[in-house]
Amino acid sequence: MKKAISRRDFLKVVGVSAAALGMTACGGSSASTSTSTAVSTAASSTASSAAAGAGEGGSGNDYKLTWNEVNGEDYGATVGAHTFAEKIEELSGGHITIDLYINGTLGSEAESMQGIQMGTLDIFRGNASSLPNYGAELIGTTGLPYVFKDMAQFEDVAESSLGDELLQSVEDANCGYVALGWLVEGPRSMFITPKVYERLGKPTDFTLDKMKGLKVRVPETDLMINTMDALGASATAIAYSELYTSLQSGVVDAAENGVTSYMSNSFNEVAPYFITDAHTFGCGVILMNADKWNGFNDAEKGWIKEAALAARSACYEYNQKQEQACFDSFADKGITKLEVSDIEKWQ
C-alpha cells in the first residue's frame, strides 16, 4: 500500500520550500478538510445518481461550454479534455457539450486565465503554480520545487481529502475561478540548446553550477520565476506560443517542461539536450468561470465533477504510457539525456 503524504507533512514541506524561495506560503485557507470532503462526497453521490439516467435532475437547459488548451493533440491534458467532453455529454444526455480548442487557438495561458475570470472563456486547464498570481494562494504550493518525490505521491494527495481541500481553496479565494479537478502531466525538467551545450563543454551529466546565468524560459508566474532564480538561472517569462522560436533564435538558452510536452511540441528540434532534474510537477487544474459554475444546479454540478474525475484518470494513464515512450525514442530522435549527478543540491 502506498503511503499518502499527510496534510500536516504537506504543509510543513511547502512552508520550508516557500521560505527558501522567499515567498509567502498559506498554511491554511478558508477551506477546511471537512468542508472539502463534504463537497467531494456530495458531488460523487449526485454524479452516481445521474449515471443511472443520463440527464435526469438537470435544469433542462442546453449549455455549450468553450474550453481552450495551449497544447496540441498528442498531450495528456488534451486527452483529458476530450474525455471530459465525452463524459459530460453522456451524463447530461446531450444538454452540456464542450467546444474544445487546442494549440492555444483562443489565447495564451495568461490570456486564458484572464478570460476565465472575465467570463469570456468557460474552461481552461491552467497550472496550479499560476493561480497565486490571480489570488488563489494555497493550491499554488503544489508547484513548489521538490514537494513531491514522484507521481505516485502526487496521486495520493489528489485522491485524498487534502486534494479536495486544495481544489476547494480556489473557489473559496473568490477570485473568479472554480477548480473542477486535476490534469497532471508529471515531472517538469530542463532542456538546453546545442549552443549552450557547447558552451558548457559538452558535459556527460548536469550539475547545479551549470545553471548559473542560463536564460531559462518559464511560464508567466512568480513561483516559477522565483524557482529558476533560486537555482541560479536567469528566469525569462515568455508566452508558450513563442517558446520554440525563442529557443531557435537564442532569445533563451533553455526552458523547462514535462517530457511529453517537450516532444509533442517538437522542442527537441531546437533544444535536444534533456536534463532529468524533475524540479517540479506540472499540476494542471481544470478551471471554470465561477459565475458559470454557480449557474448549474446540483445534478449538473455532479455530472461536471464526475467528468473531471474521468478526465484526470485518462490524462494520468496517457502520461504514464507516453513518458516512457518519449524517453525510449530519444536515441532515434537524436536527443541526449543528461542525468543530474548532484540532485541533493537542487532540492
Regions found by a protein language model. Name each.
Residues 21-22, 165, 312-315:
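A short hydrophobic/aromatic micro-motif that marks alpha-helical segments and, especially, helix-coil
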Residues 168-170:
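Short, hydrophobic/aliphatic alpha-helical segments
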Residues 34-56:
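Ser/Thr/Gly/Pro-rich low-complexity, disordered linker/stalk segments of secreted
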Residues 2-21:
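N-terminal secretory signal peptides and thylakoid transit peptides that target proteins
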Residues 26-36:
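Bacterial lipoprotein signal-peptidase II cleavage site
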